[in-house]
């Protein structure tokens, strides 16, 4: 009974953790309301766009930690891979459908990245590298995020085939990739029409 109670409690805590709008709070400390500034998105990329790199680094760190910490707790409690994945999913759901923002939120790139970095560093690190390289070349956050998601999906498939990744973790990664693509559908439309926002100034 206790593991079940602990699992349920951790899922709820993960959702609440994911719901904390770190990017919105950091931007507010800089005197900016993300909901009416930049792209209007409450994610870390919009913090960079509207508040600068220092604020972005804080927001990114917070958004990653709110995915990573519940996942680490689930692993520390010895939960099964499936239960750990459910906890990570709850954190991502909290970010995208925050109880503190009227069940709206960001696009789960940083929070999902924190979960994947905890579950499978060999999946997350190539994704982070792909994000950095793609963003440096294009200066378009959506392109970098979608590229990173694709690389993580491929890395998960390779590691699963090599027996180096639990199937539940691989399925989580692929589900996260699908969710990130879905949440970027408006960005994809703007990319097709050539109207997607590009960073003019990085630092």
From Swiss-Prot:
One of its GO terms (molecular function) is acyl-phosphate glycerol-3-phosphate acyltransferase activity. It is a multi-pass membrane protein. The lineage of its organism: Bacteria, Bacillati, Chloroflexota, Chloroflexia, Chloroflexales. This is Glycerol-3-phosphate acyltransferase. NCBIfam families: glycerol-3-phosphate 1-O-acyltransferase PlsY. HAMAP family: PlsY. Pathway: Lipid metabolism; phospholipid metabolism. It comes from the Bacteria.
